[in-house]
């Protein structure tokens, strides 16, 4: 992420939300892509929070289905990046997070089936705003591992950010699942997916990860890089850049 301290003056920002996804209507983040150099870098400043945001769910009625699904994956990824954290005493924040995840799981399929369902669009829009406005991550350590990885995918290839996140997220979850992290995945399984308690914690954790992947797939998101015609050509460059830009100081492993 580029040095945010250099952003000392910002013109007043007003947003009109046309997609529930990034949370720009209520957050301080920005991402800039430079396709000729394959760079996609983020930055942030509290000065960049919009002064006013117009959030009318009816503006989302005409979104293509893939953008509705990808936007939901982006919202969920924002929550995951802060929910899966080494910080263990943030009960309120985690309950916020679980509620937002349940909202996405409930309302994305409804919006896909009935694009003009006001309730579904309104709840997804509100989830977008709440996922990255600071509440879920307040007081928590987080590495934001998936976003730097996906930023490299969409820096080198013309893919939708949320699609890349949906592909990366379940694989990241399986990679980090360990004795140190399994209890959090058990919480996720029980509190978000309403799965019954099992004696085998790892079996329950993997069921929750499988449910996450299936949800994205059922929403119509391609779930492999092959489907997007992405091969291993740039993987080494991507990996180096992801670590350089994202860092591993608070990685949840």
Tell me what each language-model feature is.
Residues 185, 192-253:
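C-terminal charged capping/lid subdomain of soluble metabolic enzymes
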Residues 19-21, 69, 135, 160, ...:
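Short glycine/serine/threonine-biased micro-segments
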Residues 82-211:
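Active-site segments that bind and position negatively charged phosphate/pyrophosphate groups
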Residues 2-92, 183, 187:
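A glycine/threonine-rich phosphate-anchoring loop and its flanking beta-alpha core
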């Amino acid at each position: 992420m580029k040095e945010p301290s250099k952003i000392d003056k910002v013109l007043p920002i007003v947003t009109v939300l046309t997609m529930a996804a990034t949370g720009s209507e209520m957050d301080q983040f920005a991402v800039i892509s430079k396709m000729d150099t394959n760079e996609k870098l983020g930055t942030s400043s509290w000065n960049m929070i919009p002064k006013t945001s117009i959030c009318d769910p009816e503006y989302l009625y005409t979104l293509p289905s893939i953008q509705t699904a990808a936007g939901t994956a982006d919202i969920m990824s924002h929550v995951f990046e802060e929910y899966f954290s080494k910080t263990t005493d943030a009960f309120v924040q985690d309950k916020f997070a679980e509620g937002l995840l349940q909202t996405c799981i409930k309302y994305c399929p409804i919006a896909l089936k009935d694009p003009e369902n006001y309730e579904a669009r309104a709840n997804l829009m509100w989830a977008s705003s709440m996922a990255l406005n600071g509440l879920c991550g307040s007081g928590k350590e987080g590495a934001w591992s998936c976003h730097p990885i996906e930023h490299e995918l969409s820096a080198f290839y013309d893919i939708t950010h949320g699609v890349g996140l949906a592909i990366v997220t379940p694989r990241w979850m399986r990679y980090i699942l360990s004795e140190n992290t399994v209890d959090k995945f058990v919480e996720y399984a029980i509190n978000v997916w309403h799965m019954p308690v099992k004696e085998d914690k790892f079996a329950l954790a993997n069921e929750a990860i499988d449910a996450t992947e299936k949800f994205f797939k059922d929403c119509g998101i391609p779930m492999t890089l092959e489907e997007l015609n992405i091969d291993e050509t740039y993987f080494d460059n991507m990996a180096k850049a992801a670590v350089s830009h994202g860092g591993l100081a608070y990685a949840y492993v």
